[in-house]
Amino acid sequence: MGKLRHIAMQVPDPAKAAEFYMRVFGMKKVGETDWENARGVYLSDGVINLALLNYKTVDAAGAERGVDYVGIHHLGFWVDDLAQTREAIEAQGGRYWMGEAVAGGGFYEVKYCDPNGVVVDITENGWGGAVKNVVAFDPKVEA
């Protein structure tokens, strides 16, 4: 079975977006790109690769989205401390959108919007079928 390990988002300013995800969720910068189709920053939490891209042409972005399109629908982070993460999101320019954690450990998440308006779920309880901690393939990478 395939495992989700890469998410790409179209953002207006990849470096600024990268700062948000690095400061709030502790993601690490693993690469950059700047070529004829796009410029971008690549981040990872040790399991998932997140590409923050700004496409330069309609052909590269896809005609159905165009160069002004921003985002995917949402992505989710399984966090250790919900209250601390909420504070960090707001301190970095994110805003609360909807939802609250379910008492007693239900799976529902709290939804925020990052500074670009992309929906970010946060939860201490995880999602069905998801594994919070994994063993890193590369021992130099913290999982």
Where would I find each of the regions flagged by the language model?
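N-terminal beta-strand motif that seeds the catalytic metal site of vicinal oxygen chelate
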Residues: M1-K16, I72-F77, G126-A143
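Core segments of cupin and vicinal oxygen chelate
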Residues: G2, A8-L50
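Vicinal oxygen chelate
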Residues: K3-P12, V41-S44, A63-A143, ...
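Short, charged/polar surface micro-motifs in flexible loops or helix N-caps
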Residues: G46-L50, T57-D59, L82-Q84
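Conserved beta-strand in the GNAT
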Residues: A51-L53, D121
